[in-house]
């Protein structure tokens, strides 16, 4: 305690904080960290950094234009500058398609930047499979986490330098730039994947950064909040939004333009930081440098559905696999071809189904090319004609 009282007054002119300035000042500390990221400067003018491996997952939220995307870019560039491609791999999910797509070609990426929300859901499910695979490897080597595994592999490499089958395990950082878009497309699958990654993936060296500009409870659900202990709040419109992010007020009083409250895991009081800024020109120079040093080699299977991910995505909460066709599926296909049009409400009336079941069947018909895409409130057009159906049966 002190015998004085301090009152925070914002400066008339905001002084920008450059990423380069923070990295140069904290270079030694960052080199000793597993996953160092640059945050900015606190109210005393001290440069602030964080280690994602200790975070271990991070929620970034704030209203439009408050500085979220700049913060995400500074995190990515901190990792590109301080770590080699074999030390850390990035999975970037960018539903907005313009914010992170310029990182394509960087060797640190595990796969090309994911812009399709449906592919993003599949990518998250494949990350869960990678986590399970890593735990199997840990069990085989009798180690508890990625640090123990890499130490054991390093010792084996020193003993057998000619053995090319021994490799160190790289960290994986998954960055989602806009969670709200993913929750609209596949909220159940995305929420399940986030829950599994945040609960178990830390020891496997997989870390998650989730950003959203809609800090409402339908996006930042209880499951997401409970499993992501570290938070960054930028300026928001109301105290309710601040409570959704930080479980306390304060973010509604921030100034915007990178002014943030950082609440790391285990801390009760958030730290006020002026977030660092990185220009588009600097980002391009970092990308050009890293791309020149090494050719990118991507794993395209991350965004592709396989048998394992299909079983994850189609299993319900109670473990029931909904990948099997509905018992009425063939009858509904015949009905659709006869009538030439189909809708969820039509199936409800004709087959006496509940709305959820009818909507699932309509989605399945579209997925298999039986009916066309949604056209406002009109019934869906059937793409398979009667004579074609008869030919296939013959």
Question: Locations of the language-model features?
Answer:
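Conserved short hydrophobic interaction patches
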Residues: 78-79, 130
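P-loop NTPase motor-domain active sites and their immediate coupling elements
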Residues: 2-36, 41-43, 47-49, 54-55, ...
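The conserved Walker
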Residues: 63-65, 212
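Short hydrophobic/aromatic beta-strand immediately N-terminal to the Walker A/P-loop
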Residues: 58-59
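P-loop NTPase switch/communication element
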Residues: 53, 80-118, 122-125, 223-224
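Conserved lysine of the Walker
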Residues: 68
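Hydrophobic positions on the alpha1 helix immediately C-terminal to the Walker A/P-loop
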Residues: 71, 75
